[in-house]
Design a protein with these regions (language model features):
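Feature for intrinsically disordered/low-complexity regulatory segments and propeptides
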Residues: 1-61, 68
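Intrinsic disorder/low-complexity polar-acidic segments
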Residues: 65-193
Length: 193
């Protein structure tokens, strides 16, 4: 699935030190560093709890596997930027592609997610069928599940993984048939209450 070799590191908080060697009060900030290279990634608050990239990916993968989504010819793209400061994940599931409504082009279900350890990207992810999307969670299509928020405030990896699983179950089950029926149901002013 996703490339775990690119995620083979963890991060942890460390005290910062002034030029004269005295420690900086942790209430002012702490240094977030990779544990393998000791490379600094960001200054974070004392109460900040780092979320490891590997934990996110592992739980999302379990959710996808348990959903029953057809992984035939699925593509998984794992991008890590700036030595681990940022992560972007993308997956496409062509076995479930659909032609929606009057359109004849095929729309492929997708999963996208990005986050960062350097505060540039919040936790931002979506599952659905769309022709185009932006990271403000706007899509030209259908977003079946999403998360959007600050890095760790209110972000729960298990809750997000469950949303991904539910959306994938919808895609792999009767959901797509229902969605096509909705698209093909003609309505007019007289039939709308």
């Amino acid at each position: 699935m996703f490339d775990h070799n690119k995620l083979n590191f963890t991060v942890s908080k460390h005290l910062m030190f002034n030029v004269d060697g005295t420690p900086v009060d942790p209430a002012i900030g702490m240094l977030l560093k990779r544990t393998d290279t000791q490379q600094p990634l960001s200054v974070v608050s004392e109460g900040y709890e780092p979320v490891q990239y590997g934990d996110i990916v592992n739980q999302v993968e379990v959710g996808l596997q348990e959903s029953g989504i057809d992984m035939t010819d699925a593509t998984f793209d794992t991008k890590v930027f700036h030595n681990g400061e940022q992560l972007e994940l993308r997956a496409k599931f062509p076995a479930h592609q659909q032609a929606m409504g009057r359109f004849t082009d095929k729309v492929v279900p997708q999963f996208v997610f990005r986050t960062s350890h350097n505060k540039t990207w919040g936790n931002n992810g979506m599952v659905g069928l769309w022709r185009s999307m932006c990271w403000n969670t706007l899509v030209s299509g259908h977003k079946l599940a999403y998360t959007y928020g600050r890095h760790t405030k209110g972000f729960s990896v298990p809750v997000f993984a469950a949303k991904v699983k539910n959306a994938a179950e919808f895609i792999s089950g009767e959901g797509m048939t229902q969605m096509n029926e909705w698209y093909n149901t003609m309505v007019d002013r007289d039939t709308i209450y």
